[in-house]
Amino acid sequence: MAKEELLEMRGQVVELLPNAMFRVKLENDHEILGHTAGKMRKNRIRVLVGDEVLVELTPYDLTKGRITYRFK
């Protein structure tokens, strides 16, 4: 079984939400709901409002994503 193709996009965190969720505004001005990836949680990488992040999206649901990297 092949792994699905993920879309990677850059965005900016607009709002912090409960349960480690974030509202992220993508480069193309769409807003999505994102959560931090497991490695970011494990290493306790903090994501704050205004941070530039890399988000993985599945082609099936383009309204939710996983934050995989925080740019410095």
From Swiss-Prot:
Keyword set includes rRNA-binding: yes
Superkingdom of source: Bacteria
PROSITE patterns listed in its UniProt record: S1_IF1_TYPE
InterPro entries: NA-bd_OB-fold, RNA-binding_domain_S1_IF1, S1_domain, TIF_IF1
SMART domains: S1
S1-like domain span: 1-72
Subcellular location: Cytoplasm
N-terminal signal peptide: none
A Pfam family the protein falls into: eIF-1a
GO CC aspect terms: cytosol
One MF annotation (Gene Ontology) recorded for this entry: rRNA binding
Keywords: Cytoplasm, Initiation factor, Protein biosynthesis, RNA-binding, rRNA-binding
Coiled coil ranges: none
Metal-binding is among the record's keywords: no
Subunit architecture: Component of the 30S ribosomal translation pre-initiation complex which assembles on the 30S ribosome in the order IF-2 and IF-3, IF-1 and N-formylmethionyl-tRNA(fMet); mRNA recruitment can occur at any time during PIC assembly.
Family statement: Belongs to the IF-1 family.
Function: One of the essential components for the initiation of protein synthesis. Stabilizes the binding of IF-2 and IF-3 on the 30S subunit to which N-formylmethionyl-tRNA(fMet) subsequently binds. Helps modulate mRNA selection, yielding the 30S pre-initiation complex (PIC). Upon addition of the 50S ribosomal subunit IF-1, IF-2 and IF-3 are released leaving the mature 70S translation initiation complex.
Protein name (record): Translation initiation factor IF-1
Provenance organism: Rhizorhabdus wittichii (strain DSM 6014 / CCUG 31198 / JCM 15750 / NBRC 105917 / EY 4224 / RW1) (Sphingomonas wittichii)
GN (gene name): infA
